[in-house]
Amino acid sequence: PLACAETMMESAAPIQVKNVPNCYRLSPKLYRSGQPGNDGFKALEKLGLKSVLNLREYHNDAGKAEHTGLRLYRMRLAAGKVTRKELMDCLLIISSAPKPILVHCWHGSDRTGIVCAAYRIVMQNWTSEKALEELMDERFGHHQSYYSNLAELIKNTDWQAFKEEFRKKQQAQGI
């Protein structure tokens, strides 16, 4: 069941992309950032990305990504109320989308951070402690004082059960 696992401990590498703030490569398949600006989506496509998962509640990427071949996905997350089910749905999108894929929110820190932490645990077999450490890494700008719920979600999730449920859902969807 772990045949699709990626490199276990590849660290996030900063990537300079025009009009894409807080951009990092987490693996050959996954990138993270803040909201891409004008021409940011074209620059991402030029970099070789195939898909974008937008985690913002009230902002759609369709206008700025127009005239690109990027596949756009959206999950409306509220940083103060992210649920286990929402993480599951995000990972199912990431696992089925053409890659590489970029995950972003407004700042690329809180919503993006929790989704990337779940990805690290489920897809790359990181420990929850290591994923939490990356979530809290000051490079990404996590707002711990506002969103302590995100660290609690990582700490309180039964990741073994989560992984089993994820694999079953993947199989059911033919991913």
Where are these regions (language model features)?
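Cys-dependent protein tyrosine phosphatase-like superfamily
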Residues: P1-I101, I114-I175
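Short cysteine clusters
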Residues: C105
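Substrate/cofactor-recognition hotspot
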Residues: G108
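Conserved lysine of the Walker
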Residues: R111
